[in-house]
Each structure stands twice: as structure tokens, then as C-alpha cells.
Amino acid sequence: MVATTKQDRIYNKQKNGDFDLATTRWGPDYGDPTTYLTMGISTNSNNYGKWSNSEYDQLVDQVGVESDVNRRWQEMKDAEKILLDDYAYIPVFEKGAATLQNPKVKNLVIKPCRTISFEYVEKTE
């Protein structure tokens, strides 16, 4: 059965885990996979499904302090696998934004999470 409710109650119902299926909005805060992975940590306030997996939490914590980029990447892949195999979570990402750019500006990189890289920017005449 589908039940409708007023907008002001939806957030509270989700926050309290009072739902069978729910959608919500959220977008990445920065250009690193951990912006997504931290959403599944058992103590994350956006973890509305109250999912908890101590192995996952430990992996994501380790990713936060790992200095070896190859190990860090593998730990993120391992955490993602746990998240997608064990958690009833379907990440859907669609974000739109308009950007005006002077045609004389070349090689400006705007990533999907809206971070901008000026590393290779050139201005032509």
C-alpha cells in the first residue's frame, strides 16, 4: 500500500526509520569517493535505513587515514562491495547546473560534483 503524507512529516519519518521504501535528496560535497561511502556508516545522520555493518564502518574509517593510494583505492572498492551487496540502497545521482564560459577560456574542467579544476586552463585570443 502506498501512503502519502505531508512534506514536513516525511523527513521525520525517514529520520526515525518509519518507512518501507523512501527516496531522499543528497549530493556529493567533494570530489572523492568517500563522500558517498560515508553515507553508509552506521553513525551517519543520513543513514535513514539504520543499516549497520561493523566491517564496513572499519573499512571506511581506515580509508580516512590510509596514506598509500593503492591500498586506499582497494579499501574503497571493498567497502563499496559490502555496501552494494549488503545494504538495500540504490544510489541515483542526477545533478544539473548551467555554466557560462567565455569561448576564449579553454581546458576548464568541471567535474560532476561541481568541483572545478583550473590546472590546465588557458585563455586564447
Where is each model-derived feature located?
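Short secondary-structure boundary micro-motifs
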Residues: 22, 32-33, 47-50, 76, ...
